[in-house]
Design a protein with these regions (language model features):
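Active-site-adjacent structural elements that line small-molecule/cofactor binding pockets in enzymes
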Residues: 1-300
Length: 300
């Protein structure tokens, strides 16, 4: 089973950016299989919508390092771990810029990028970037079309509702062909259908506590059905599970969630956000926790 960890990107860690390189290097030395970033712009004073699955807007989202910059640092200081995003909010970005950033990081890392994308959920963040939230689904779909075009063969050309690219040359392509694997987060029927029709895999999320396999298996049943309807092989779709933690969670509890996901939901790749809700208070603390999680999981 592959085990990874989020880079120290949010909250107090954002004020110590040197920790990104330090954690990435040491996580690789311990044998971590993947390193991950998220994508947040701001923490509203009076949020209209709270973080999915919670009743609050996490305070650590008040400070967040740029995900592309953090992944670039990790790409440069490591040689083996996969480098993923969970998730980049695709509708915020002009596809040529998103395609270029991910292709560049894939080049710098020697082909280790996992492009984890989502539709977004914060109305305040959508307003901040000037994108109508009501268009997020259609923009997301067009973004996926455009990424495939920009990462494909030259000449590149795209004509859509939101973006248009006249025929031209884009010679910086991802090392991975036809592009980095695209994994999507999804919480709605439409989102799950999108995963089945368009993606290489699904990015569910859980928190430590009693693990319920249907958190993974329920959506995957709908996703695989959508894949079959689209003429795709449903068994080719992967699952990478995100485990969000919070202060007070035990290392044994975290490892138990990962192991139950492996044994009861056939999850073969999971990553743990040790800095979510301030479980790890420093890079040294995060390294210690990561090492203990790795030891517990690999012992079983």
């Amino acid at each position: 089973m592959r085990i990874g960890f989020n880079l120290p990107q949010f909250g107090s860690h954002a004020h110590h950016p040197e920790g990104v390189a330090e954690f990435a290097r040491r996580a690789e030395e311990m044998g971590a299989d993947s390193l991950w970033v998220g994508d947040r712009l701001l923490a509203p004073l009076e949020p209209e919508v709270n973080y999915p699955g919670t009743t609050a807007f996490p305070a650590e989202f008040r400070a967040g390092l740029d995900p592309f910059a953090a992944l670039t640092v990790a790409a440069v200081v490591t040689t083996r771990p996969l480098l993923g995003s969970s998730v980049l909010v695709a509708p915020w970005y002009a596809p040529p810029l998103l395609a270029r950033s991910l292709a560049t990081i894939d080049q710098l890392s020697g082909g280790r990028v996992i492009a984890g994308l989502g539709a977004g959920w914060s109305p305040e963040e959508f307003r901040a970037v000037g994108v109508p939230m009501g268009e997020r689904g259609s923009r997301f779909d067009e973004c996926l079309d455009a990424l495939a075009a920009y990462w494909g063969t030259n000449p590149v050309e795209h004509h859509g509702r939101f973006w248009t690219t006249a025929a031209g040359y884009v010679d910086v392509k991802p090392v991975q062909r036809p592009g980095p694997p695209v994994y999507l987060a999804a919480f709605t029927p439409a989102g799950m259908t999108r995963v089945g029709r368009r993606a290489d895999g699904f990015l569910p999320a859980v928190t430590p506590g009693p693990f319920e396999p249907t958190i993974v298996t329920g959506p995957m049943s709908r996703i695989r059905a959508a894949a079959a309807r689209a003429g795709r092989d449903p068994h080719e779709l992967g699952v990478i599970l995100r485990v969000n933690t919070m202060a007070g969670d035990s290392v044994h509890g975290i490892a138990e969630v990962v192991l139950r996901a492996r044994d009861e939901a056939a999850v073969d790749h999971a990553f743990v956000d040790l800095t979510y809700r301030d479980l790890a208070t420093s890079v040294e603390h995060a390294v210690d926790l990561a090492g203990r999680v790795l030891d517990l999981v690999r012992a079983r």
